[in-house]
From Swiss-Prot:
SUPFAM superfamilies: BPTI-like. This is Kunitz-type serine protease inhibitor Bi-KTI. Keywords: Disulfide bond, Hemostasis impairing toxin, Protease inhibitor, Secreted, Serine protease inhibitor, Signal, Toxin. InterPro entries: Kunitz_BPTI, Kunitz_BPTI_sf, Prtase_inh_Kunz-CS, TFPI/VKTCI-like. It is found in: Secreted. It comes from Bombus ignitus (Bumblebee). Negative results: does not inhibit factor Xa, thrombin, and tissue plasminogen activator (t-PA). GO terms for molecular function: serine-type endopeptidase inhibitor activity; toxin activity. Residues 30-80 form the BPTI/Kunitz inhibitor domain. Expressed by the venom gland. SMART domains: KU.
Amino acid sequence: MNHKFIALLLVVLCCALAVHQVSAEVPSHCTLSLATGTCKGYFPRFGYNIEMGKCVEFIYGGCDGNANNFRNLEECQQSCSV
């Protein structure tokens, strides 16, 4: 049982270090959530998805977004990709 606990602890630590390393390399504005905003517009935009490690398309409503909001894929990749 002691060996299982140690193995589990090592897995958790490795995962935590991997997430920390990726987060440290990505600019802080790219770690923000993909905010659709509160308005009802329909604007295709791109934002960095920290869990997927890449830029993805989402729909922006037109207001109350954040800095993780780019007009095209290239803009997002230039700003956020590591």
